[in-house]
Amino acid sequence: MKHIIIVTSPEVAGRKIQRTLGLVRGNTIRARHVGKDIMAGLRHLVGGEIYEYAKLLAESREQALDRMLAEAEQLGANAVVSTRITTSVIMGGAAEMLVYGTAVVLEE
């Protein structure tokens, strides 16, 4: 995969947008693991970070981001601007991670 610039702003500082290619997105839906739920439940009782869920969310975010970048690369983009990350609960124990933005071609 080629290097694609990702920013949350609508433009890349010091670079001019030559062409806008459109919306790109990547998502993943993950379910919790029963065994990890037990450990997370115990940690919830005593306080502190719930590592099992933090790891699950980090992996989900990376997978969704990779999928968005693959879509941007297919369009010929060298940057994605206005990037956003959202999460939503799909059903009990499952959540969606969605990463989206606008694929663009920046002048070299």
Identify the function of each model-found stretch:
Residues M1-K36, L75, A95-E108:
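N-terminal presequence-like segments and the immediate start of the first folded domain
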